[in-house]
C-alpha cells in the first residue's frame, strides 16, 4: 500500500514538474544565425495571404523605393484561408449577416456594427477598383460577381426581428434597396431552392439585397502578388518558414527563416515586420517575445461545407442566403446556402459545420494549440473554456455529426436536397482570439485585431471574420498605427487617390454613397442603385444595368460569422 502511495505521489510530482517545464519553456531564446544584410530591408511580410499582399500593395505604391521581402511557408501564394475553397467568399457588407445586428433589451436593433462593416467593404471595392484600373487585377468577373445577399428566417419572433432589422437598416444610404417580404411566392422568386418542398403552413420571411457580391480572395491575392514581383524592390520567398524573431538594440528586427527545400537557416534584418500568417500569427507573435504577446492566446476551429456542383442545382441558386444560428450556438454556426464562382464554374456551398482540430492552419501541425500554451495564458484559457461552455458543447456535438445529421440541417434551407447531391469539403482553419481584458481577465474576442509593439516596428493581425472582405480597410488602420510620420508626410494624399472616400464616412452622405458606388460598380462590373437625397423606405428600386467590361431574438450575440 505504501509503495503504491509513493509511486502515485512520484507520478504526480513528475507530472507537475513536466507541466511547469512545458509552461515555462522559453519560446524565443535560442541560437540563430546573424543577419546577412548590414543594411536592413524596409519591410518583411510573413505569410502569403491576402493581408500581407494587400499591405505590400499599399506600400509599393506609397513608397516604391522601399525594399520588401515576403516569406511563405508553403509552395504558393494564398494556399490557406485566402484560397477560394477555404472561405465562404462572402463580400461581407452586413447585408445578410444577422449577428451583426443584435436586438437590444428594449427591442431596438443595434446597427452600428453593420454600418461599420458595410463602410469597410466599400473601401475594399475602392481598393480593388484602383488595382483593376492600374492592371494589377484581372477582369473583375474573375474575382468578384454580383450575388444578391439574403437573410432567411422562420417563426413569428424571428420574422418580427427581421422586419425591425430591415426597417432600421434601410434608413441608411448603404442599405438602400434592401427588400423585405413574408410572401412565399416572392421569396421563391428570389431563391427557389429555399422554398420548393417547404410546407405551406410554415411562416417565413426574407430580406433581399441586390448589391451583394461573391468574392474569390484567392484570385485577388495571387494576382496582386504577381504584380508585386514586377518591382526589383520586392522579393518573394516560397517554401520558407520563419523560425525566430529577435529585436536588435537599434529597434530593427532579425527575422530567421528556414529554407524548407534544404533545411538551411538564415536571418534578414528589417526595419518593420508584419505577421500576416493567419492562424500561425499567434505563435509567431509569441516568438517575437514582445510584452504585448503575453496578453493573447488562441482557440482553433475548422470548417466544413456541403458542396453542390450539379448544374441542375447551381443554375437555380444565384444568391447567398444567411440564416440565424440556433439559440445558444456560437457564431461559426450561422448557416448559409451560398452561390459561389470557383475554378471557373458555379458552385453552391452549405454550412459551415465546425471541425474540431488543434491545428492553427489547414496545413499546420496537430501540436499548434499545445505549443501556444504557456504560463502567461494557460489559466486564462481554462477560464475562457469554463465561461464559454456553450461553445465547448457545440464543438463536441459537431464532432459527432454524421452525414445524416448534416443532411438534416441542410433540409432546413434546401428542403428538396438529396444526399447524393453533395460532397463534404473541408475549408480553412480559423483561430479565435483569447485576449486579456483589464477588468474581466482572459475573454474570447471576436473579429480581427492588430497587435503592435510599443516601438511600432512589429505588427500582427490576429482573429478571423470578416477578415479578407475588409482587408484593405484593416491594412489602412495598420498603416496609420505603424507609420504615423509617413502618413503626415504625404501618404494620406496618395491614399485619397487609391481610396477616394479616405477620411470620410460613406454612410453619412447619400451623395458620397452614390459617387463611390457609381465609380466602383462601373469598374467592377457590378449593379448600381441610386440613393435618393433623403434616404427612405424604397419602393421597388430600379437597379441600373451592369456595366459591361470590354474584356433574445438575436440567437447569436457574438458579432461574427464564418
Swiss-Prot record:
Protein's UniProt keywords contain Endoplasmic reticulum: no
Ranges of Polar residues composition bias in the record: 551-562
Span list, region Disordered: 530-562
HAMAP family hit by this protein: MQO
InterPro entries reported in the protein's UniProt record: FAD/NAD-bd_sf, MQO
GO terms of biological process kind: tricarboxylic acid cycle
Cofactors demanded by this protein: FAD
Molecular function GO terms recorded: 2-hydroxyglutarate dehydrogenase activity; L-malate dehydrogenase (quinone) activity
Native source species: Xylella fastidiosa (strain M12)
Annotated pathway: Carbohydrate metabolism; tricarboxylic acid cycle; oxaloacetate from (S)-malate (quinone route): step 1/1
Highest taxon listed in the record's lineage: Bacteria
A Pfam family it matches: Mqo
Reaction(s) this enzyme catalyzes, per UniProt: (S)-malate + a quinone = a quinol + oxaloacetate
Gene: mqo
Enzyme Commission number(s): 1.1.5.4
Gene3D superfamilies assigned to the protein according to its UniProt record, in alphabetical order: D-Amino Acid Oxidase, subunit A, domain 2, FAD/NAD(P)-binding domain
Keyword Flavoprotein attributed: yes
Similarity remark: Belongs to the MQO family.
Keywords: FAD, Flavoprotein, Oxidoreductase, Tricarboxylic acid cycle
Protein name: Probable malate:quinone oxidoreductase
Amino acid at each position: 500500500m505504501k509503495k503504491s502511495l509513493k509511486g502515485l505521489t512520484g507520478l504526480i510530482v513528475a507530472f507537475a514538474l513536466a507541466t511547469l517545464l512545458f509552461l515555462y519553456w522559453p519560446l524565443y531564446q535560442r541560437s540563430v544565425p546573424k543577419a546577412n544584410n548590414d543594411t536592413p530591408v524596409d519591410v518583411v511580410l510573413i505569410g502569403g495571404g491576402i493581408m500581407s499582399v494587400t499591405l505590400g500593395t499599399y506600400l509599393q505604391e506609397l513608397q516604391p523605393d522601399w525594399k520588401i521581402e515576403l516569406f511563405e511557408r508553403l509552395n504558393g501564394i494564398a494556399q490557406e484561408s485566402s484560397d477560394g475553397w477555404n472561405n465562404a467568399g462572402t463580400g461581407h457588407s452586413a447585408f445578410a449577416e444577422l449577428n451583426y445586428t443584435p436586438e437590444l433589451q428594449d427591442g431596438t436593433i443595434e446597427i452600428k456594427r453593420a454600418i461599420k462593416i458595410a463602410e469597410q467593404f466599400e473601401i475594399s471595392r475602392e481598393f480593388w477598383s484602383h488595382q483593376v484600373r492600374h492592371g494589377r487585377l484581372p477582369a473583375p468577373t474573375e474575382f468578384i460577381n454580383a450575388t444578391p445577399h439574403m437573410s432567411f428566417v422562420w417563426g413569428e419572433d424571428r420574422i418580427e426581428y427581421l422586419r425591425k432589422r430591415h426597417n432600421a437598416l434601410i434608413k441608411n444610404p448603404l442599405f438602400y434597396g434592401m427588400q423585405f417580404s413574408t410572401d412565399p411566392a416572392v421569396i421563391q422568386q428570389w431563391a427557389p431552392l429555399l422554398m420548393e418542398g417547404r410546407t405551406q403552413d410554415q411562416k417565413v420571411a426574407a430580406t433581399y439585397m441586390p448589391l451583394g457580391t461573391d468574392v474569390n480572395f484567392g484570385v485577388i491575392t495571387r494576382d496582386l502578388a504577381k504584380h508585386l514581383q514586377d518591382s526589383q524592390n520586392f522579393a518573394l520567398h516560397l517554401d520558407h518558414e520563419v523560425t525566430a524573431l529577435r529585436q536588435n538594440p537599434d529597434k530593427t528586427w532579425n527575422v530567421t527563416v528556414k529554407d524548407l527545400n534544404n533545411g538551411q537557416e538564415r536571418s534578414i534584418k528589417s526595419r518593420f515586420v508584419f505577421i500576416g500568417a493567419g492562424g500561425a500569427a499567434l505563435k509567431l507573435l509569441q516568438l517575437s517575445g514582445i510584452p504585448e504577446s503575453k496578453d493573447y492566446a488562441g482557440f482553433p476551429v475548422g470548417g466544413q461545407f456541403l458542396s453542390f456542383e450539379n448544374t441542375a442545382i447551381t443554375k437555380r441558386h444565384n444568391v447567398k442566403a444567411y440564416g440565424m444560428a440556433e439559440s445558444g450556438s456560437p457564431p461559426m454556426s450561422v448557416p448559409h446556402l451560398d452561390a459561389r464562382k470557383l475554378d471557373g464554374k458555379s458552385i453552391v456551398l452549405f454550412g459551415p459545420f465546425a471541425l474540431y482540430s488543434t491545428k492553427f492552419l489547414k496545413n499546420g501541425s496537430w501540436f499548434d494549440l499545445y505549443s501556444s500554451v504557456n504560463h502567461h495564458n494557460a489559466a486564462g484559457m481554462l477560464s475562457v473554456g469554463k465561461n464559454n461552455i456553450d461553445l465547448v458543447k457545440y464543438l463536441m456535438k459537431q464532432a459527432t455529426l454524421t452525414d445524416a445529421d448534416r443532411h438534416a440541417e441542410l433540409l432546413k434551407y434546401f428542403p428538396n436536397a438529396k444526399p447524393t447531391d453533395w460532397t463534404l469539403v473541408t475549408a480553412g482553419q480559423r483561430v479565435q482570439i483569447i485576449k486579456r481584458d483589464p477588468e474581466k481577465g482572459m475573454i474570447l474576442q471576436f473579429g480581427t485585431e492588430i497587435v503592435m509593439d510599443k516601438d511600432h516596428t512589429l505588427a500582427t493581425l490576429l482573429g478571423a471574420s470578416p477578415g479578407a472582405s475588409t482587408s484593405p480597410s484593416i491594412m489602412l488602420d495598420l498603416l496609420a498605427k505603424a507609420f504615423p510620420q509617413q502618413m503626415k508626410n504625404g501618404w494620406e494624399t496618395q491614399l485619397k487617390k487609391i481610396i477616394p472616400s479616405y477620411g470620410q464616412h460613406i454612410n453619412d452622405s447619400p451623395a458620397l454613397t452614390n459617387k463611390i458606388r457609381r465609380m466602383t460598380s462601373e469598374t467592377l462590373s457590378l449593379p448600381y442603385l441610386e440613393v435618393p437625397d433623403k434616404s427612405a423606405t424604397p419602393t421597388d428600386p430600379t437597379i441600373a444595368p451592369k456595366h459591361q467590361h470590354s474584356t433574445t431574438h438575436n440567437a447569436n450575440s457574438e458579432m461574427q460569422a464564418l
